[in-house]
């Protein structure tokens, strides 16, 4: 949406009258809707820009169902932003870091540091909520400082909440080495041992208890942190059996 508004803004000043995108801070938004006043530009031209960007997104991100459309609506009323404030919102959307920032040097293919813009909305004021994740605390702090600096440059304010500590990967783990053969014996298959890029309770526990050896297990969850998230019920029973057997052997 930021890219779309930026392209329209290059042709004519804009005033945002409403902005709604995303519903959860830690999830990638599925849709975004904006009402605006475009002074002196016809709807046909705006739709041409939308169509061009839609084709680019479908090709670049392999999203054949991605849709960008413009409609002629009554955009007046509500909390309309000035052209200057609208320009700052567009600058934020286009300039803020987003997505993968660094990959792990220990585990190929593992994201080490990332963030996403989860919620953006215009109420009494415009607000944007980012979720920042990293398995290295120093990198997370650096990314948070980038967001703080960007807010300051655009005459905005910055606040932070819901922080959880990083859970750094341990190359040696007695608990992990104990659980692998138990899984193999129970299910006749090789367990898939992975490091993941997510905020988990293990990070909180390991921060409080120095040297804690911990492993995260759970049932199969598909399309996590999206509107299509769902749980495989049969895997819940398998996880319970596995947990009981691990506890017997500790």
Where in the sequence are the language-model features?
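Midchain, well-structured core segments that form catalytic/ion-binding scaffolds
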Residues: 1-132
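His/Asp/Glu-rich mid-to-C-terminal helical/loop segments that flank catalytic regions of hydrolases
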Residues: 2-11, 42, 84-94, 101-102, ...
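Short glycine/threonine-rich loop-to-helix capping motif typified by GTGT followed
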Residues: 26-33, 78-84, 168-181, 204-208
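Zn-dependent metallopeptidase/amidohydrolase metal-coordination segment
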Residues: 105, 112-114, 118-127, 131, ...
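Short, flexible active-site loops
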Residues: 125-134, 158-165
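C-terminal, non-catalytic macromolecule-binding modules
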Residues: 129-155
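Short, contiguous acidic/charged loop-to-helix segments that flank catalytic cores in large enzymes
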Residues: 135, 166-170, 230
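Generic long, charged, amphipathic alpha-helical segments
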Residues: 152-186
């Amino acid at each position: 949406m930021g890219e779309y508004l930026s392209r329209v803004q290059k042709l004519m000043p804009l005033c945002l009258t409403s902005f709604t995108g995303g519903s959860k801070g830690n999830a990638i938004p599925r849709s975004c809707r904006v009402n605006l006043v475009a002074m002196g530009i016809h709807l046909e031209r705006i739709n041409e820009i939308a169509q061009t960007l839609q084709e680019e997104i479908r090709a670049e991100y392999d999203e054949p169902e991605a849709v960008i459309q413009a409609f002629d609506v009554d955009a007046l009323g509500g909390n309309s932003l000035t052209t200057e404030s609208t320009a700052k919102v567009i600058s934020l959307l286009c300039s803020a870091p987003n997505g993968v920032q660094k990959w792990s040097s220990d585990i190929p293919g593992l994201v080490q540091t990332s963030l996403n813009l989860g919620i953006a909305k215009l109420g009494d004021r415009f607000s944007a909520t980012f979720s920042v994740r990293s398995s290295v605390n120093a990198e997370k702090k650096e990314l948070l400082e980038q967001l703080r600096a960007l807010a300051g440059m655009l005459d905005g304010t910055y606040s932070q909440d819901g922080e959880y500590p990083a859970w750094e990967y341990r190359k040696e783990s007695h608990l992990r080495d104990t659980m692998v053969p138990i899984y193999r014996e129970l299910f006749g298959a090789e367990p898939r041992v992975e490091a993941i890029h997510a905020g988990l309770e293990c990070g909180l526990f390991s921060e409080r208890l120095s040297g804690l050896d911990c492993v995260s297990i759970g049932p199969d969850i598909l399309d996590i942190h999206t509107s299509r998230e769902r749980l495989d019920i049969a895997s819940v029973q398998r996880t319970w059996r596995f947990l009981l057997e691990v506890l017997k052997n500790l």
